[in-house]
């Protein structure tokens, strides 16, 4: 269990602090009044800060030594359905989620219409029965079937899809890690197809990157969504690799409405079982190797990163299948004896036993302080039910404070075994506010508002799904906390833009490119 409380870094922050530093006070005590007036000027404070740190460069640019403005790129692609909302705008978040759901439904239906026979041949006729049950077009024998059997078929079919997806991803990763001469014919074909997709993505990203402004955090605007999804899908389960409707595991599950059937019959929400359409580490690798060939080993790392999310989803489904469904069946039998209900149907009372509060679902939950809400907000990030982990990530942007802490697990009907470790969300939130209240840089009014906020519960602003694995999500959060250079690049622009950049860096990651600004050229053309 870990806890980190740090001050956030911004460009020019060291310059701003130069006048109040102990080193600056010593300098002021040894120089005359005229020199002190120079020191209090804008260029003077930069000069002192620069000289103290050994960099005359800061005199010209207003930056401290080592602070160079570079290009920063959020590792998502516009047009992929993964646009980043302002986390404090609940309406914006809900509208984007609903639009994505509608678009996905339409695309998944195309997959079912195009590949129905091949999918049934590979994963069994049970998929069609589940789909017909959900659509109300079930045959007489299916209607007579027990609802629990339909639920079992939906879970089993989903398990088959995730097993196959995991297997194919591991095959691709193993092929990429082998020497070219050691690959079988099938592995060579698989790697060649994958490399063709990477080249298509690389070309699209390179075109966008050339048009980026130097001094802004950017998102990559990609190709049309259909082409983008086809190009970024490592191994389609059915059909050609670059078809317009790709039969991915995600698309097959959506086409046959497996999660919806499971939710309708059991009350168990599995919408958190997601995989990224475009793996952020792939975008990062392409940006890193944009001027040279990408080695197979780097691509293998990206494939394994995406496979972590698939394996996490698979473990979650096995947890539901092996741990939760037997308890669900037992609850059904108990309810049947008490209420005398029909054996074929599942009573709503049974479903309600397995409902969990929205604030404990495996998502990124967003809260803000009741006062000074634009600046003081935090994320509560919860893992899949089988892992039962969570962490707190709080920000006070008015005084540049960040607080990360691993929290204790919640108990609920779908959770795994508990361990008494860590603190609760409420305890972490109160300590976060206490640290902000005691900060010397806060204004008197801000401190008063924080004291008031501490007396009441924070405002819940909704939740967002994350597509990457929880391990990668935690890694992104810790990088935001520890990486000063990343902080400098995401904490620029209007306050709502900074919040979006923080959320983007958390959900997808952020790549700070190594291209340094050509300062003489910049000043010459300014």
Curated annotation (Swiss-Prot):
Residues 1-42 are annotated as: Involved in membrane permeabilization. InterPro entries: Capsid_VP5_Orbivir (IPR000145). Its main location: virion. It is found in: Virion. GO terms for biological process: symbiont entry into host cell via permeabilization of host membrane. GO terms for cellular component: viral outer capsid. Disulfide bonds: none annotated. One of its GO terms (molecular function) is structural molecule activity. Keywords: Capsid protein, Outer capsid protein, Viral penetration into host cytoplasm, Viral penetration via permeabilization of host membrane, Virion, Virus entry into host cell. Belongs to the orbivirus VP5 family. VP5 protein is one of the two proteins (with VP2) which constitute the virus particle outer capsid. Acts as a membrane permeabilization protein that mediates release of viral particles from endosomal compartments into the cytoplasm. Permeabilization activity is probably negatively regulated by VP2 and is triggered by endosomal degradation of VP2 and exposure to low pH. This is Outer capsid protein VP5. It comes from Bluetongue virus 1 (isolate Australia).
């Amino acid at each position: 269990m870990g806890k980190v409380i740090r001050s956030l870094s911004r460009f020019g922050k060291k310059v701003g602090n130069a006048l109040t530093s102990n080193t600056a006070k010593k300098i002021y005590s040894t120089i005359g009044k005229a020199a002190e007036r120079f020191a209090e000027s804008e260029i003077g404070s930069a000069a002192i800060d620069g000289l103290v740190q050994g960099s005359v460069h800061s005199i010209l640019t207003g930056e401290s030594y080592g602070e160079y403005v570079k290009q920063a790129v959020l590792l998502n692609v516009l047009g992929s359905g993964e646009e980043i909302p302002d986390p404090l705008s609940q309406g914006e978040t809900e509208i984007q989620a609903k639009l994505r759901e509608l678009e996905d439904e339409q695309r998944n239906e195309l997959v079912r219409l195009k590949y129905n026979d091949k999918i049934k041949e590979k994963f069994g006729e049970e998929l069609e029965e589940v789909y017909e049950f959900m659509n109300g077009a079930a045959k007489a024998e299916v209607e007579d079937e027990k609802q629990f059997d339909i639920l079992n078929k939906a879970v089993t079919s989903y398990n088959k899809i995730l097993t196959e997806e995991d297997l194919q991803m591991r095959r691709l990763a193993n092929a990429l890690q082998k020497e070219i001469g050691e690959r079988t014919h099938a592995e060579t074909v698989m790697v060649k197809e994958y490399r063709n997709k990477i080249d298509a993505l690389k070309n699209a990203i390179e075109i966008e990157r050339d048009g980026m402004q130097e001094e802004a955090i950017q998102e990559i605007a990609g190709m049309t969504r259909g082409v983008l999804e086809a190009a970024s899908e490592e191994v389609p389960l059915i059909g050609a690799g670059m078809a317009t409707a790709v039969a991915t595991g995600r698309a097959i599950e959506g086409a046959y409405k497996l999660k919806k059937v499971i939710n309708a019959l059991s009350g168990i929400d599995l919408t958190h079982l997601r995989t990224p359409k475009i793996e952020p580490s792939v975008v990062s690798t392409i940006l890193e190797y944009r001027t040279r060939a990408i080695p197979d080993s780097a691509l293998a790392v990206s494939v394994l990163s995406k496979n972590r999310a698939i394996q996490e989803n698979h473990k979650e489904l096995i947890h539901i299948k092996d741990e939760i469904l037997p308890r669900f069946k037992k609850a059904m039998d108990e309810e049947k004896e008490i209420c005398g209900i029909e054996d074929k149907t599942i009573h709503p009372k049974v479903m309600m036993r397995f409902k969990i509060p929205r604030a404990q679902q495996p998502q990124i939950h967003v809260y803000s302080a009741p006062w000074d809400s634009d600046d003081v907000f935090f994320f509560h990030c919860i893992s899949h039910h089988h892992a039962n982990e969570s962490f707190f990530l709080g920000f006070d942007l008015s005084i540049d404070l960040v607080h990360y802490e691993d929290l204790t697990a919640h108990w609920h009907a779908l959770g795994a075994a508990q361990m008494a470790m860590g603190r609760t969300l409420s305890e972490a939130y109160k300590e976060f506010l206490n640290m902000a209240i005691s900060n010397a840089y806060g204004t008197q009014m801000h401190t008063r508002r924080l004291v008031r906020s501490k007396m009441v519960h924070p405002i819940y602003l909704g939740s967002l799904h994350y597509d990457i694995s929880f391990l990668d999500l935690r890694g992104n959060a810790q990088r935001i906390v520890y990486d000063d250079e990343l902080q400098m690049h995401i904490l620029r622009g209007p306050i709502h833009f900074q919040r979006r950049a923080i959320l983007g860096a958390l959900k997808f990651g952020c790549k700070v490119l190594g291209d340094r600004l050509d300062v003489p050229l910049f000043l010459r053309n300014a």
